């Protein structure tokens, strides 16, 4: 029952790192416009 919550927490931890790394890379920004806004 707790699996989805744990996954959401893990995603919240991972996302800022992805955002920083990806959004400093123009090619990645183009591939992930919703993450880099």
UniProtKB/Swiss-Prot annotation:
Alphabetical keyword list: Acetylcholine receptor inhibiting toxin, Amidation, Cleavage on pair of basic residues, Disulfide bond, Ion channel impairing toxin, Neurotoxin, Postsynaptic neurotoxin, Secreted, Toxin
Effect of residue 32 to A: Loss of ability to inhibit alpha-3-beta-2 nAChR, important decrease in ability to inhibit alpha-6/alpha-3-beta-2-beta-3 nAChR, and loss of ability to inhibit alpha-3-beta-4 nAChR
Known outcome of mutating residue 30 to A: 8-fold decrease in ability to inhibit alpha-3-beta-2 nAChR, decrease in ability to inhibit alpha-6/alpha-3-beta-2-beta-3 nAChR, and loss of ability to inhibit alpha-3-beta-4 nAChR
Record keyword Heme present: no
Propeptide residue span(s): 1-20
Primary location recorded for the protein, binned into one broad class: secreted
Annotated phenotype, changing residue 31 to E: 3-fold increase in ability to inhibit alpha-3-beta-2 nAChR, important decrease in ability to inhibit alpha-6/alpha-3-beta-2-beta-3 nAChR, and loss of ability to inhibit alpha-3-beta-4 nAChR
Disulphide linkage map: 22-28, 23-36
Effect of residue 31 to A: Loss of ability to inhibit alpha-3-beta-2 nAChR, important decrease in ability to inhibit alpha-6/alpha-3-beta-2-beta-3 nAChR, and loss of ability to inhibit alpha-3-beta-4 nAChR
Molecular function GO terms recorded: acetylcholine receptor inhibitor activity; ion channel regulator activity; toxin activity
Record localization: Secreted
Site residues by UniProt (Moderately Important for binding to nAChR): 34
Recorded GO CC terms: extracellular region; host cell postsynaptic membrane
Family of this protein: Belongs to the conotoxin A superfamily.
Role this protein plays: Alpha-conotoxins bind to the nicotinic acetylcholine receptors (nAChR) and inhibit them. This toxin inhibits mammalian alpha-3-beta-2/CHRNA3-CHRNB2 nAChR (IC(50)=9.4 nM (rat), IC(50)=8.8 nM (human)), as well as the subunit chimera alpha-6/alpha-3-beta-2-beta-3 nAChR (CHRNA6/CHRNA3-CHRNB2-CHRNB3)(IC(50)=2.1 nM (rat), IC(50)=1.7 nM (human)). Binds to rat alpha-6/alpha-3-beta-2-beta-3 more rapidly than to alpha-3-beta-2, and dissociates more rapidly from alpha-3-beta-2 than from alpha-6/alpha-3-beta-2-beta-3.
Protein name: Conotoxin Bt1.8
Organism of origin: Conus betulinus
């Amino acid at each position: 029952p707790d699996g989805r919550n744990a996954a959401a927490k893990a995603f919240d931890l991972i996302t800022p790192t992805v955002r920083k790394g990806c959004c400093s890379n123009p090619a990645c920004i183009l591939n992930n416009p919703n993450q880099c806004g």
